[in-house]
């Protein structure tokens, strides 16, 4: 057999030509110790703060403490599989999450992975979870209403698109119920074919709640047809602390996609007390020095950098907005604890819910005296401004008088009238769950209350009067609601028509 030199040299030349010189470089470290969701890693000298790292078994982690001889990594998952001596490699990417309209109608975990069994998420891009909030120049003052559908909030503590309004109260006072009703109330705005400037997408972040509670919440959204314009981010009680810590940031990034693309979104963090507890756990295990109530010194910055990302952007930036409704759970109505005072000082107002009111049957259990909205009437339509100004004043007088009336039995007629009107208005502001009212319906009902049409009724008939009046306005007299809806104002002409309808209805009701 003859050896063909030319053929051999051709093969060798071909192989030399295709010889790849690029080698895959990966920086690898070793696990020194692991426990309680924290791993100490040696050898990752160039790792960035907040960078994702990957353990041997595929579990991800995030480098938080960069020390001289090791790196403190928080583990996004179970630490049982990770053992001392295993390798850890850099991913060269900061923690990111999927964003986009493909997430609507889905339930995802704290890193944006779907957990609802509906398959992979379609057509999305990825964004970093912890980015800087918009500066001062791109912002605009809040001027459009973000309707919750609850009379006591939309009339007395109005929320605007781009505002941050805290919902604060003890456990079992209806904080999540307010959030849920707000999501359900956006259904008429999110109809097919509606303009993007009208729509309001919803992001609900569940932190440290029971899985059954989150499942129930999602079920209600599905039944009411509200899941199609919502995203649920869940880091439940059984998830490790790092997942509960990162979930609000992931949710915020999902909401920011809408804000930055000229759309509107509302995000509900339920609740930030549990995120602070998870962050405290991580910080103590990373041996960071504790401060007040054993929280780390930067727990204020944790919440401020999250909530500052909710904003109303100006015309050059596309006019989008992200409204934040953080929830804080207090212990025995103590709003002077560390986390509640922090979040109160960051937000643009708060809705106080009280156990006593809840058990008196005033639901939503909003304490109107202590609750404020620092945006105020600029977040209301003209029609609502006209009727809400009056009810605010009357309720304030009523609260003052009710305190004094406990002492004196012989009250003059004017005081008696005031107390009578106040108790009727308080009754009027009650509202059952899952029955949000449109702005124009609230205006008509509150108008009837402040103009004295309820004064003669017994307290237990107020709800029936309201239901009957609304049925009449939605049916035969729908022109009045239509006029208020289109003009967003209560003109003299419409007010006269409304007066005639309410007067004739009051006669038949009596």
From Swiss-Prot:
It catalyses: ATP + H2O + 4 H(+)(in) = ADP + phosphate + 5 H(+)(out). GO terms for cellular component: plasma membrane; proton-transporting ATP synthase complex. It is found in: Cell inner membrane. Its main location: membrane. Keywords: ATP synthesis, ATP-binding, Cell inner membrane, Cell membrane, CF(1), Hydrogen ion transport, Ion transport, Membrane, Nucleotide-binding, Translocase, Transport. F-type ATPases have 2 components, CF(1) - the catalytic core - and CF(0) - the membrane proton channel. CF(1) has five subunits: alpha(3), beta(3), gamma(1), delta(1), epsilon(1). CF(0) has four main subunits: a(1), b(1), b'(1) and c(9-12). This is ATP synthase subunit alpha. It comes from Rhodopseudomonas palustris (strain ATCC BAA-98 / CGA009). The lineage of its organism: Bacteria, Pseudomonadati, Pseudomonadota, Alphaproteobacteria, Hyphomicrobiales. The gene is atpA.
